[in-house]
Amino acid sequence: MIQRDFFGRWPLAWIGFALLVLGIPAIGFAHERGADLGAILPAVNATLNATSGVLLYLGWRAIRARRIEVHWRLMVSATVVSACFLVVYLTRVALTGVHRYPVEGWSKSVYLAVLSTHTLLAATVPFLVAVTLWRAAHERFDRHRRIARWTLPIWLYVSVTGVLVYLMLYHLAPALA
């Protein structure tokens, strides 16, 4: 088994790791000082989701070009950014609770359809990613490719719909109200 350097000289993974380690105490500090985390954290989460989606796409492009080391680093970076998202999301829910879509009508139906598929698939992503990365790290590339064909589109869908849910809940709904 090749010992892979998860962070190496790849700065994005280090940035994600720093966000995870330093960001959570900063959120707690801001909350203690009365900052409106309900307004800040959803935008942070949408940014993390978008970043993860871009990294996933670039990682897919890298492997299609047979740039294996670049692919590995991009996918590990996407994993770190997604882990940051999960921690910030759970922190936001713990601090501010869940948010309901404030408008009735067709937009709520679309929102709930997107949200339900996003939520169901998001629950599978950590497990799919863990298995996919484990197989790559242990050089079981035939099995890695088989599960990656499922992991990538699901993970990309969850990243994109995460941004869409944010836009619908925090920007579209208030505009329609």
Features from the language model and the residues they span:
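Alpha-helical membrane insertion/targeting regions
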Residues: 1-177
